[in-house]
Regions:
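N-terminal intrinsically disordered, cationic/polar leader segments
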Residues: 2-14, 18-40, 48-52, 58-73, ...
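Catalytic-core signal marking the mid-to-C-terminal active-site face
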Residues: 2-22, 34-46, 54-55, 60-67, ...
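Short beta-alpha connecting loops at secondary-structure transitions
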Residues: 29-32, 307-312, 340-347, 376-387
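Generic structural signal for well-ordered, non-membrane alpha-helical segments
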Residues: 36, 40-47, 57, 61, ...
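Flexible, glycine/charged-enriched surface loops at secondary-structure junctions
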Residues: 57-65, 76-79, 156, 216-217, ...
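Helix-rich catalytic cores of soluble enzyme domains
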Residues: 133-364, 368
Length: 506
């Protein structure tokens, strides 16, 4: 048994050389689009009609209304209407491709173009593991999950609210989360959007970690604001949008849509609604700061019309992504959408097939930034420790898939045919020996041995293997390097702002 485990460890060590370890994935295959030119024209015309005839509400923020009014939009109370083509004209200043810089330059990522990123789940108040079950998340969980994502090569981004640390007061949670992303990882991360001062704090912490001038001149934060579908942007999201736009940081406009309740029950109508909401909101970003990085985002989950609950891994969810990506390309914006979503409460077969369906659909659609790619359980109410490493394994496989096939002369292996001849085998061929470490992708989570091997090694189910891997990763974790002066500045900022906000020491 010991020998078998030793062999497995050696195989994993060798296969690690074959893993995707670049900061992001470069696609070398085409995308799947389910919308033709005639349908595109119809959806775009319908979005224009929605904005022209119905309009969109921008609530609770007089400055936003004044910005639109001064630019020539039609403002009536909090309702703003736009002439056809007006929003597209403003959106043209947004970059098609840009770089989000990480604290470690080697981990900076391209957003848009042929780049694809896998990002953690966002926002769950609960965590789950197979030993302790479901429970409220704490800042300790936040730290552990950030360490996991830092250690997983297949995860390209540290994320944002990977879990909600409910043991901390709400007004200071953003400080601890940004501090964790900056000190426990050196991958790029997401900014706070729940209040303007929290956005400003996040930007300031990045200035401490990466240099004021650098942050003022480059994109270092990727932040998501959600519309309140249908056709509403509320004051909280508007405040965050304005802060990040003025700072030249990336803002993703992602309508949160539960199909059948927050949009009509058809994919076609939902596409028009989402396009309208994104165009109006990105136009605002470009009015505030032309050229500010902006991203077309979506979160679409059809409701079960029997129970009223969101559903995941559905045909309609994938169809929607495979159309929305084309609409984003037409606007010249990078595309952000969802990955491994599931309604399952534990990392079981339902979690596997729903997550794989949604994740594969996102990859084939060509989504540039795949959020919720790891960890989702219970429709994003929960992040699962085991689910994180299980999903990351699928991300690694799909990253290998989109790199395409090697058709080089070496890959043709003609000398191997001559060496082996008819009736032979290739296991000992020179070509095999030269390429066996990189020939086929080999994951960490699947058991491919015989039944006898599996039994001898404990008969572990996948969630058992995942639990062991989580413990191993956390045991072996080493924090990325950070200058002691920068670390002290971040610690001091956290302590000072905590005292200013709460009157208590951190």
């Amino acid at each position: 048994m010991q020998e078998r485990r030793g062999r497995s460890a050696r195989m994993q060590e060798r296969s690690a050389k074959n893993r995707i370890s670049t900061p992001y994935v470069l696609r070398r295959i085409g995308i799947v689009s389910l919308i033709d030119e005639e349908a595109v024209a119809t959806i775009e015309a319908n979005a224009d009609r929605i904005l022209d005839e119905i309009g969109m509400d921008f609530r609770g923020d007089a400055e936003t209304l004044e910005i639109f009014r001064n630019a020539g939009a039609r403002v009536d109370g909090e309702r703003v209407r736009f002439d056809p083509g007006w929003c597209r004209d403003r959106i043209r200043t947004a970059p098609k491709v840009f770089t989000q810089h990480a604290r470690n330059p080697a981990r900076s990522v391209q957003i848009g173009g042929d780049a694809q990123l896998f990002c953690p789940s966002f926002g769950p108040p609960f965590v789950h593991d197979m030993e302790k079950g479901r429970r409220y998340a704490t800042i300790h969980d936040f730290h552990e999950i950030t360490k996991l994502h830092y250690s997983l090569n297949a995860v390209n981004h540290s994320g944002g609210v990977v879990v909600e640390p409910v043991d901390l007061p709400v007004p200071v949670r953003h400080l601890h989360m940004a501090h964790s992303h900056l000190t426990l990882s050196d991958k790029p991360f997401m900014g706070a959007v729940t209040a303007p001062e929290r956005a400003r704090d996040t930007i300031e912490m990045c200035r401490l970690a990466m240099g004021r001038d650098f942050v003022d001149e480059n994109c270092v934060l990727y932040s998501v604001v959600n519309t309140n579908a249908p056709l509403v942007m509320d004051e909280t999201m508007l405040w965050a949008l304005k802060e990040y736009a003025r700072a030249g940081q990336c803002t993703v406009v992602s309508p949160f849509v539960l199909g059948g309740a927050m949009s009509p029950v058809t994919v076609a109508a939902t596409l028009a609604q989402v396009l309208a909401e994104v165009m109006a909101s990105v136009a605002l970003i470009q009015l505030i700061r032309p050229g500010a990085p902006s991203v077309f985002g979506t979160f679409f989950s059809p409701l079960s019309l029997r129970t009223g609950a969101p559903t995941f891994g559905t045909p309609e969810g994938t169809q929607f992504q495979m159309c929305a990506k084309t609409l984003a390309d037409r606007l010249g914006l990078p595309f952000h959408s969802v990955g491994a979503l599931t309604a399952s409460k534990v990392p079981d077969a339902q979690a596997g097939y729903e997550s794989q369906a949604q994740l594969t659909g996102a990859v084939m659609a060509g989504v540039n930034f795949i959020i919720h790619a790891t960890g989702c359980l219970e429709g994003l109410l929960t992040t699962g420790y085991e689910k994180i490493v299980m999903d990351a394994d699928r991300c690694a496989a799909l990253a290998r898939f989109v790199q395409g096939i090697d058709f080089s002369e070496a890959a043709q292996a003609m000398e191997a045919f001559r060496e082996v001849g008819p009736g032979g085998h290739f296991l000992g061929a020179t070509h095999t020996r030269e390429n066996f470490e990189s020939a086929f992708w080999l994951g960490d989570m699947s058991d491919n041995g015989t039944y006898e091997q599996w039994t001898a090694e404990g008969g572990l189910w996948q969630h058992d293997r995942a639990s062991a891997r989580v413990k191993r990763i956390l045991r072996d974790y080493e924090a990325p390097e950070m200058d002691i002066g920068i670390r002290e500045a971040l610690d001091d900022f956290l302590a000072r702002r905590t005292f200013e906000i709460t009157g208590e020491k951190a």
